């Protein structure tokens, strides 16, 4: 598939193994939710696997690839999920897949690696003489396999150019929100952050939930106004502002 235009945003998620599907699914959901908040119509997602076959995970949960990874010669964003234990899976990955990742990176694709997916990025040569983050459980192994790469042991996430690294299978929301801001703006990022960070003890989160309680309806015009109120950078919203946004009279 050829390079997308500026009106489209293509995301390809590589699910390397049947474990830790959350590293892929939740990353896609963060971006998809942000695209909905931003009312971005050209958002496209694809899921691929190393052998182009379905993956079976815990409890019989399966991931079906929507395309073959070889069919993409460009994507705006490539998300590489956790590969589980690298000792069991890293050497089983087709060398051509590493070449593909390198080519995408050279063409300007953003490469997001989550948890032990960082091993894949390292083996593809994207971190040579550079820095990385890694889950503490696999940090020693990473140091043995890639001694030339400096591990930032006090960090959980790292962004270097078009490479985005998150060290845990369930702690990648901050990295994904950075991408949300780059493509959809700061206000959509803030909205997504509030949506993801709802905590019972947080007064701000509670008030945010109160707002969403009033958005459980199908009136498209009212929903448009409600989303606009949530994302606008105005401190005070007047009746005139609402009327202009809704293309209605103030009455």
What are these regions (language model features)?
Residues 59-63, 147-149, 166-167:
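Short, surface-exposed amphipathic charged segments that create phosphate/polyanion-binding patches used
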Residues 128-156, 192:
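A conserved active-site-flanking secondary-structure segment within enzyme catalytic domains
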Residues 87-88, 120-123, 129, 141-142, ...:
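Short, well-ordered, mixed-charge alpha-helical segments that flank or form enzyme active sites
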Residues 1-111, 120-123, 181, 186, ...:
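Extended, subdomain-level signal for the structured scaffold at the beginning of enzyme domains
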Residues 154-195:
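Conserved anion/nucleotide-ligand pocket segment
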């Amino acid at each position: 598939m050829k390079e997308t235009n500026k009106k489209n945003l293509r995301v390809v998620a590589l699910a390397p193994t049947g474990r830790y599907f959350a590293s892929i699914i939740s990353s896609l959901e963060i971006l998809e939710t942000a695209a909905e908040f931003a009312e971005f119509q050209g958002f496209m997602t694809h899921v691929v696997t190393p052998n182009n076959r379905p993956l079976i995970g815990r409890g019989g949960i399966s991931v079906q690839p929507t395309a073959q990874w070889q069919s993409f010669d460009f994507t705006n964003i490539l998300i590489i999920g956790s590969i589980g234990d690298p000792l069991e899976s890293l050497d089983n990955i087709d060398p051509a897949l590493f070449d593909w990742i390198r080519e995408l990176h050279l063409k300007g694709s953003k490469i997001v690696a989550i948890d032990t997916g960082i091993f894949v990025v390292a083996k593809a040569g994207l971190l040579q003489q550079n820095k990385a983050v890694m889950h503490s459980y696999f940090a020693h192994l990473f140091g043995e396999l890639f001694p030339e790469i400096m591990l930032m042991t006090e960090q959980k996430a790292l962004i270097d150019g078009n490479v985005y690294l998150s060290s845990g299978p369930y702690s990648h929301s901050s990295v994904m929100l950075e991408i949300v801001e780059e493509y959809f703006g700061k206000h959509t990022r803030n909205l997504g952050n509030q949506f993801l960070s709802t905590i019972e003890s947080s007064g701000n989160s509670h008030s945010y939930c109160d707002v969403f309680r009033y958005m459980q309806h199908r009136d498209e015009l009212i929903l448009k106004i409600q989303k606009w109120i949530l994302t606008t950078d105005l401190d005070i919203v007047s009746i005139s502002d609402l009327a202009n946004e809704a293309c209605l009279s103030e009455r």
